[in-house]
Amino acid sequence: MCAARLAAAAAQSVYAFSARPLTGGEPVSLGSLRGKILLIENVASLUGTTVRDYTQMNELQRRLGPRGLVVLGFPCNQFGHQENAKNEEILNSLKYVRPGGGFEPNFMLFEKCEVNGAGAHPLFAFLREALPAPSDDATALMTDPKLITWSPVCRNDVAWNFEKFLVGPDGVPLRRYSRRFQTIDIEPDIEALLSQGPSCA
């Protein structure tokens, strides 16, 4: 069993994990976000839904961030090589290419990582184990096997860019959404969690 899967198996919540910010510096412990509602997405700057999903991620962070939502983006190049920029190039790609028009993410972006296979970031190994399939499409799979570039291949693999994981204020993953489920449409689920008040976690 690889290190990522061992870490995932031992974890009880996302608070066991950390990730390095896209702009560099010390890793951010997700434990520092205890009590917040987290929306975690694997992102890519050259995907057909980049404009839609990035702008909707910004919108949710803008509207619901003051009430306790934290949006986290993890660039990944495993799906059609649609995040082939270097870490230091991604923000400029977003600003000038897609979405373009001076776009700047107002949510936390982390360094590029893998979400599937032996090299998967331990956070995503944990999320996939906790939520094996998207709630809106339990049969979601990679649509073109020729594009699978990782090993081993598992039934709970992330199928494409912009899969979403909603995590409660106790750090426990609650719901997974497919790439086809629009980010903005998660708002009612987030609102339901926010209305429950602060967690004792």
Swiss-Prot record:
Modifications made to the protein after synthesis: During periods of oxidative stress, Sec-47 may react with a superoxide radical, irreversibly lose hydroselenide and be converted to dehydroalanine.
Record EC number: 1.11.1.9
GO biological process: arachidonate metabolic process; glutathione metabolic process; hydrogen peroxide catabolic process; lipoxygenase pathway; response to hydrogen peroxide; response to selenium ion
SUPFAM superfamilies: Thioredoxin-like
Record site feature (Subject to oxidation and hydroselenide loss to dehydroalanine), residues: U47
Residues annotated with N6-succinyllysine modification: K86, K112, K146
Keywords: Acetylation, Cytoplasm, Lipid metabolism, Oxidoreductase, Peroxidase, Phosphoprotein, Selenocysteine
This protein's name: Glutathione peroxidase 1
Upper taxonomic lineage: Eukaryota, Metazoa, Chordata, Craniata, Vertebrata
